């Protein structure tokens, strides 16, 4: 931080330190990373969830889910209690340890959830299997987020709904600059999270039609309602 402040005082910019190719996330790295932090994951994100207000954003977005629901990269199951009562829910994640936590959360809330270990980039479901496909705070860690989004599109029914809550570049210049400067540090400290991505660009690149989108919490969290084209 001292070097950044010093550079700013001298009128110089501090260039971002990009993520080295050798440290790019792979499916195996992603699984191992989240297996290691599974039992502490909810503590690690407590501030974002409860102080910044991410819980409120989850609730508002997921209240729109209907029918047969797929939760992609469900993690420890934080979305589970937020779906409408009586929903038919399938939840998948690459990390078996995260799914163990999700199973405990399902028991806690008295819900019967179909849980499966699965790679978001290779969903093992037939085309058009779900009325609603959900993913929250996940595209920022997928090795190939566009491929994962294309898979979500594939398994969503043509008239279905895709609901996303994602990290992204802020529309506030000072904060966007901070995100860029600290891209690599954040990536290292937050399990491979690329917090300065452009979620809308990823969604559109995957051939998904955006119905509504909204920036939240200083423009860093994007709520997106979309459907397959």
Which sequence ranges carry the predicted segments?
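C-terminal alpha-helical "lid/dimerization" subdomain adjacent to the S-adenosyl-L-methionine
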Residues: 28, 45-48, 163-221
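C-terminal lobe and adjacent flexible extensions of AdoMet/dcAdoMet transferase-like proteins
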Residues: 223-229
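A short acidic, Gly/Pro-enriched loop at the edge of an enzyme's catalytic core
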Residues: 121-133
């Amino acid at each position: 931080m001292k070097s950044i402040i010093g550079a700013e005082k001298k009128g110089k910019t501090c260039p971002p330190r990009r993520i080295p190719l050798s440290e790019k996330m792979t499916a195996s790295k992603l699984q191992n990373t989240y297996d290691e932090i599974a039992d502490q994951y909810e503590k690690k994100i407590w501030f974002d969830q409860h102080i910044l207000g991410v819980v409120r954003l989850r609730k508002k977005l997921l209240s729109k889910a209907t029918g047969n629901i797929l939760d992609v990269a469900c993690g420890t199951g934080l979305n589970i209690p937020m779906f409408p009562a009586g929903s038919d829910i399938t939840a998948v994640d690459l990390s078996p340890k995260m799914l163990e936590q999700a199973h405990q959360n399902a028991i806690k809330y008295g819900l019967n959830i179909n849980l499966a270990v699965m790679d978001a980039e290779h969903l093992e479901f037939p085309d058009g299997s779900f009325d609603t496909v959900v993913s929250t705070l996940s595209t920022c860690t997928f090795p190939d987020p566009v491929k994962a989004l294309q898979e979500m599109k594939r398994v969503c029914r043509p008239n279905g709904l895709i609901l996303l809550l994602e990290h992204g570049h802020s529309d506030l210049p000072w904060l966007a600059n901070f995100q860029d400067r600290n891209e690599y540090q954040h990536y290292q400290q937050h399990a491979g999270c690329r917090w300065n991505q452009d979620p809308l660009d990823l969604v559109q690149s995957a051939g998904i039609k955006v119905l509504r989108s909204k920036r939240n919490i200083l423009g860093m969290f994007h709520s997106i309602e979309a459907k397959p084209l």
